[in-house]
Amino acid sequence: MIGIIIPTFREKENIFKLSKKLLKLHKNAIIFIVDDTKIYNFKKEFTKIKNIQYIHRVNKKGRGSAVLDGLRIASKNKKIKIFVEMDADFSHKPEELKRNLDKFIKGDLDLLISSRYLKSSRIYNWSIQRRI
């Protein structure tokens, strides 16, 4: 089983699309959405979707702590053997996850890091301000 941690902040438009796409591609996944958005709380909507755990944090604590909180919660599920962290804005393409998971499993790896800064990588959906 795969645990996918998605830290979010003001990702109302993407969060549902991304989670549905991931669950369609990966039937053995549990998604942990760690949301720092103060004005929205999607807990009600996500409790209706199987294999999604929504964590709403009251204050914006930052991306790093959102990932750590997600990992802490996900690691309590002993069925999860592989942990993945993805951005909510589709800058990590859901379709590429399978290829990376295959490399991880076939390579008998303990850790696999993908980087958007490799020569063969592309950055999608980023404004010029974010790239700078």
What are these regions (language model features)?
Residues 57-74, 94-132:
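Acceptor/aglycone-binding surface of glycosyltransferases and processive sugar-polymer synthases
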Residues 35-43, 90:
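A conserved acidic beta->alpha catalytic loop
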Residues 10, 36-38, 61, 70:
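Conserved short acidic donor-positioning loop in nucleotide-sugar-dependent glycosyltransferases
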Residues 79-91:
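Short beta-strand-to-loop acidic/aromatic patch adjacent to the donor-nucleotide binding site
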